[in-house]
Amino acid sequence: MSYTTQDVHNKIKKLLYSLTGITLTENKDIMIKNRIEKLIRNCNYRGDIMDLLNLIEQGKYVTEFINSFTTNKTHFFREDFHFLDLKDRVLPQLSKSGQKVSIWCSASSTGEEPYSIAITVKEANEELNSNIQVSIMATDIDTSVLQYAKDGIYRYSKSSKEFPSYIKPQKYFKRRTQESFSGEEVLIKVKDELKKMITFNILNLNDETYPFRDKQFDIIFCRNVLIYFSTKDQNIILKKLFKHLQIGGTLYLGHSESLQDLIHYVKRVGQNIFIKEKDFI
């Protein structure tokens, strides 16, 4: 059976939803075709695509399937006003308590977001002449991007354009070169002092519960990932996230995401920046 048929696409949508909660809209056929080709490469599979999907349904190649169909668009300091808020409002307030600050980056992708958080903490410590101790939990469902994030190696030609003017990349990255098809390529590698601040773990936001304590986190970043879920599932995920956020803690959402049922339990202090005022009942 040809893998461009609607039957195959419908089966992929059903599988993706059952395994991750991610909903693919009707206009994603070209994307699905490209991801199918990636799936076949990842599985090193030479048979019929429908047979492969049946194997995935039976529990084989599940990791390869998830890694092939999740979207990982990100960059350093994306929506940089959130990092300015973290540096100029949140961290100065939390530094007064003298307690360790706990941050959850719930859609780590290839690591640019959690490393941007870590850099922001370092910058805040310099500005405040303080030593705020921070632990960052960075999670994602895609094991391949988590490994990329742990390695912490990025192309300089792309990444150098992503840093705000007040960030000096050489403080936080080591430069190195490697040969590529187009000649010598400059890479940057995250320094160990940043890596030590972050723990990377696999986590499916669609899981019924998360392996964290109630009110464990002072800050949660959940940006540009809810858009891949249905409105109903977005609401469910937000309520689960909310359970793990301290009262008075800050939640950052992506520019096109909203709090839905939780809007009456927070105070908005900026563009998709929310302070939790009370628990959801």
Model-derived features with residue positions:
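Core SAM-dependent methyltransferase catalytic element
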Residues: I219, Q260-I281
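Conserved AdoMet
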Residues: S2-W104
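Conserved beta-strand signature within the Rossmann-like core of class I S-adenosyl-L-methionine
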Residues: G248-H255
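Residue-level signal for inorganic ion chemistry
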Residues: L86, I220, L245
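A short His-aromatic
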Residues: Y228
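Extended basic-aromatic, gly/pro-enriched interface segments that bind polyanionic ligands
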Residues: I132-F217, F221, V225, D233, ...
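Conserved SAM/SAH cofactor-binding pocket of Class I
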Residues: Q93-P164
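A short glycine-rich, Lys/Arg-flanked "PGG" loop and its adjoining helix->strand segment in the class I
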Residues: N235-I247
